[in-house]
Design a protein with these regions (language model features):
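Aspartyl protease active-site motif detector
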Residues: 73-93
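Short beta-strand-to-loop capping motifs
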Residues: 16-20, 74-76
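Intrinsically disordered, low-complexity polar/charged tails and linkers
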Residues: 34-37, 85
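Accessory RNA 3′-end/elbow-binding domains used by RNA modification enzymes
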Residues: 8, 13-15, 30-33, 45-52, ...
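Charged, alpha-helix-enriched surfaces in structured cytosolic catalytic cores
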Residues: 9, 22, 80, 84, ...
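Short, conserved charged micro-motifs
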Residues: 21-29
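Glycine/acidic-rich beta-strand-loop module
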Residues: 1-4
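Short Pro/Gly-enriched beta-strand edge/turn motifs at strand-loop
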Residues: 38-46
Length: 172
């Protein structure tokens, strides 16, 4: 389950500002340039070694442009730095760009529209459960672990083999 959440594709909605006012044509050209496989060096403050690596931007969509403000939807490979993506787009446009806001709207098969909740909402539901002993809201937020595992392949074994499997027996 953790692998799905960590390594699955992510979707973000981001608001950023570029320092020059791009034409619609130039913006379309840049969006095309940053879609697909890109090279990205993690930002100065990151938890990983700062060496250039490839990341895949599956979809980069301009939702709205209001002068220098760009609202985008980005579907990308795990490990992509969106703040750095905005910086790089700004560098190509000249003289730079910054991300202002970022919201993750999807992790692999888990979509925001399917009932994902914020940590704040979860904390509120937990507080209600603690104070009033009412778990209705909390139980509505908790999903079965099988949901996270649904994309993984499964293996069916005989009941008689369960004990041996639990002690390291080979499948084949």
């Amino acid at each position: 389950a953790l692998g799905v959440l960590l390594y699955g594709p992510k979707e973000y909605h981001a608001l950023g500002r570029v320092h020059s006012l791009p034409s619609k044509e130039k913006l379309s050209e840049i969006i095309e340039m940053f879609t697909g496989e890109i090279f990205q060096k993690p930002p100065q403050r990151s938890a990983v070694v700062r060496q250039t690596r490839t990341r895949t931007i599956y979809e980069l969509e301009l939702i709205e442009q209001k002068e220098r403000l760009l609202l985008t939807r980005i579907l990308c490979e795990a490990g992509t730095y969106i703040r750095k993506l905005y910086y790089d787009i700004g560098e190509v446009l000249g003289p730079g760009g910054t991300m202002i806001e970022l919201r993750r709207s999807r992790v692999d098969q888990f979509h925001e529209k399917d009932g994902l909740v914020t940590l704040h909402e979860l904390a509120d539901a937990f507080a209600i459960w603690e104070e009033k002993k009412d778990d209705t809201k909390l139980m509505g937020m908790i999903k079965p672990v099988e949901l996270a595992l649904s994309e993984l392949k499964s293996v069916v074994i005989r009941d008689s083999a369960v004990d041996a499997m639990c002690h390291g027996a080979q499948l084949a």
